[in-house]
Structures are given as structure tokens and as C-alpha cells.
A protein has these predicted regions:
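Basic/polar N-terminal segments that are highly enriched at the extreme N-terminus
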Residues: 1-5, 129-130
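Residue-level signal for short segments within beta-strands and strand-turn junctions
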Residues: 38, 91, 110-111
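Hydrophobic alpha-helical segments of small multi-pass membrane proteins
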Residues: 72, 89, 104-108
């Protein structure tokens, strides 16, 4: 259970960094070779060196971000940690109205040198009921 507890604690720290709009703190959890599929991008973003400036720019353009995981699940398989679930992602841009989108997410972590590092993240917007 210690690995799952450590993984969950790491994920909670990731969520807190996102909600503070703190790209430096968030990127401290990333592996150098992270691959990200943000919910609003059709393309993958590869590597910490590429993703960090994008996160900084995104956070700089927002007054507030609220990433609220809904019943996240954690699983550990060897040195791989998986966190998945749904979230309400609320953003208030500096130049526009607040919006909320509902997203399903998967965070993949690898245990490297005793620490969980985010190696992949995927978020996809849930379809709206029409």
C-alpha cells in the first residue's frame, strides 16, 4: 500500500501545483521525456523542455485554474503508477469568461530514483449531451 499512498500523494501535489498555476512546481514532477496530450490540443507535446514553456504561457494567460478530480483511481504495477478519472476543469482567462469543461484523464508515472515522475498525461474533453 505504501507505493499507492506515495503515488496518490504525488498526484495530489500535482493537482495543487496546477491549481496554483505554478508551472515550476508542476514541472518538477515531470520526467525529462514526458509526453502530454492536453485536452484542447490535437497534438502530443513531447519533452519537458517543450512542455514547460507551454505550461508557463498557459498559466500566465489565466486568472485562475481549478482542476478538480472526481474520484481519481490509482494503480501501481511494478515501477509504473497510473492515475485516472474524470475532472471538472474550470479556467478563467484574463481576457474572457470563465469556462468549465469535463475531462477524462490518465496520468502515467514511473518510479525513478525512488520518486514518482510523470511520464505521460492524456486529457480528453467529454462530449456534451445535446
Amino acid at each position: 500500500m505504501a507505493d499507492i499512498d506515495d503515488l496518490n500523494a504525488t498526484f495530489q501535489q500535482v493537482v495543487a501545483a496546477i491549481n496554483r498555476r505554478d508551472a515550476a512546481a508542476y514541472s518538477n514532477f515531470w520526467h525529462e521525456q514526458i509526453v502530454a496530450f492536453p485536452p484542447t490540443s490535437p497534438f502530443a507535446v513531447e519533452g519537458k523542455a517543450t512542455l514547460r514553456p507551454m505550461a508557463e504561457a498557459n498559466f500566465a494567460q489565466t486568472e485562475s485554474v481549478n482542476f478538480s478530480p472526481i474520484n481519481p483511481q490509482c494503480r501501481v504495477i511494478g515501477d509504473t503508477g497510473i492515475v485516472w478519472g474524470h475532472t471538472a476543469l474550470t479556467r478563467k482567462p484574463k481576457d474572457g469568461p470563465q469556462t468549465t469543461m469535463f475531462v477524462r484523464f490518465t496520468f502515467i508515472f514511473a518510479k525513478t530514483d525512488g520518486q514518482w515522475r510523470e511520464v505521460a498525461v492524456h486529457g480528453s474533453q467529454l462530449p456534451t449531451v445535446g
